[in-house]
Structures are given as structure tokens and as C-alpha cells.
């Protein structure tokens, strides 16, 4: 693609090849050999002094509109972001993610200031420079890490690393005798703002540690660190260890209370189950009792049946006194008829009675015939 062949500087001090001023020199076709964005995350990002841009073609300046439209594969948009990155946290990662995704084809360079510069202009850090460098190398959005980055970006630095845009949050960063160290970058049209993540910062993390210093000191003493390593006095060491013992005792008491509550809850559950089962058994027993001994129970019916049988056995039914005369069958002989004859020894009381008895006997004989 066409590139500029001049290194003249603009009025802002930024080389014309890196400023927004339109090029005035002739352009020639030179192939770019700039490093490409990382395609794999199986290895950390390289350092700039180990794999710097060796492209011999002069770096043509891009506008924000051109960069957002996209660039050829061999000409990625080189975006620069810098910082201290102490106690690397999610706020840092989100800022780098925004810088990486500003343009479709971008190559993210991250500059990390050294301990000397940081201690001089900002203050002491928790992590040393080597640890901070390594933290950035293992961030997935970073393509290249620049060690010992300058506090204020110079034209020489921008030209050396062929930087197209600088990404940072838009809050003025006053330091090193300047109200805003990115002022000249903004004037050159090379500044692209990112959004700061609220609620998380290195200062907030350090504030938490300082606020709960006793807790963390006791924690590390319990984990085997010595009072000398923690810079703790003899008296404080004994105090922290005593507090640890008190906490252990509280924890034991708490565990006993929890177990006791758990035991009581289990007993209550069991008693509730037993009461419920007892009520069910009681209802079942009462129902069975009523079925057996109730007013219409089986026992009463059985008793009545037994009683009726006993009564029948003790007092059987009597046969009828008289029965109708059955017709005799012609094949059977008639039953003999017995006549009541007067007793020979007892004479009739009177002649009338004797005649009456004789007449009745004669009538009986006629009826049988």
C-alpha cells in the first residue's frame, strides 16, 4: 500500500507521518512487514525489544474513520495503551479489551512504566516491575509489551514503535508538571478514549488491605509467616496469636451450637413423625374396636346368633294338638277302632246313662261302616 517517505515534523511536534495533517510528499508502493496480532493464546505476548517492528516501510498515518473501516491484513492498526498495572485486576483487563476492539484489525501494544519512574511520579507499588510485566504478557488482549515505557509520550517513541493511536480513559491525567500528559496526543488527533471501570482500582484494593490490616496479619501468621516477615512487633504478634486462639474457640462453640440445633431439629422431626404415626394408629384402633364392639358390631351380631341358637336348643317348638284326618289309602287296612267298654266291676250309675253309652257305641259302629 502507499506510504509516506518523509519524516518531517508537524507544528504539534508529532512527525507528519503520525499526525492528522494530509501528506504532501510523493508516495510509493512498499510492502509492510509489521507484526501481526496474536492468533494463539498458548504462549505469552512477546516483549517489544525481543520482537520489535522491523518494517522498513514508512508508517502512513491513518484517521480514526479509516481505521474503523478496516485496513489490509499486512497493515494492522497499531494501538498503544500504557499504565502502571499494579495488582492487575479486572478494571485493567476491561480497559485493554476496549483498546483491542477499537478497530477491526488492531495490534495492541502495552507500555508498562518501570519502578523508578513509578516511585518518582506516583508512589510505591505492591508488585515490582518484573511482576507487572509478566502480568501484562499473560493478558489475552495484549499483542506486545513495552518495558520501561516513558511517563510522557515523545515523538521519538511514537515513531520508533509506529504507533497509530493512543487509548486511555478521557479523564485528564495530571503528572510530571503537566495538567494532562496526553494533551499533545489529543491535539494531534491520535487519542481514542476508553471507559473507566467504576468500583475497582489498585488504590481501592490497597485501601481494603490497609483497612483490614489486622485480619490479614493474623491470617498470614496462622499460615506460617513470621512476625519479622510481616514487620509486626513482638507485642502485636502475641496479640494476633491470642486473637487467633479466641477465634478458634469461638468457631468450636459455634460448631457445637450448630450441631446442637441440628440435633434438636432432628429430634423435633422424629417426635412429630412419632406423634403423627401414633395418631394414625389410634384412629385405626378405635375404628377396629367400634367395628367389633359397637352397636352394630360383629361381636353383637355373633352374640345374638349364639343366643338364638341356645334358646332354640333349650325350648324346641311343640307339635300341633290335633291334625286333620288323613284320607286312607285303599291299599292300607283301616286302623283298628277301640271302643270304650264300660267297666264290668263298676255298674252304670243309672239306667239312662247305660242306655246312652250303648247308643253312642252303636253310632260309632255305623260311622266306621
Curated annotation (Swiss-Prot):
Top EC category: transferase
Phosphoserine PTM sites in chain numbering: 315, 319, 322-323, 329, 331, 335, 346, 349-350, 355, 360, 362
Family matches, as Pfam families: CTP_transf_like (PF01467)
Compositionally biased tracts (Low complexity): 319-339, 351-362
Reactions mediated catalytically: phosphocholine + CTP + H(+) = CDP-choline + diphosphate
Binding site for CTP: 84-85, 92, 122, 168-169, 173, 195-197, 200
Disruption phenotype: Female mice lacking isoform 1 have reduced fecundity due to failure in ovary maturation. Male mice lacking isoform 1 have reduced fecundity due to testicular degeneration.
A Gene Ontology term for the protein's cellular component: endoplasmic reticulum
Gene Ontology biological process terms, A to Z: CDP-choline pathway; ovarian follicle development; phosphatidylcholine biosynthetic process; spermatogenesis
Domain of life from the UniProt record: Eukaryota
Pathway in which the depicted protein is active: Phospholipid metabolism; phosphatidylcholine biosynthesis; phosphatidylcholine from phosphocholine: step 1/2
Modified residues (Phosphothreonine): 345
Region spans: Disordered: 1-27, 309-369
Disulfide-bond pairs as recorded: none
UniProt family annotation: Belongs to the cytidylyltransferase family.
Protein name: Choline-phosphate cytidylyltransferase B
Source organism (scientific name): Mus musculus
Lineage: Eukaryota, Metazoa, Chordata, Craniata, Vertebrata
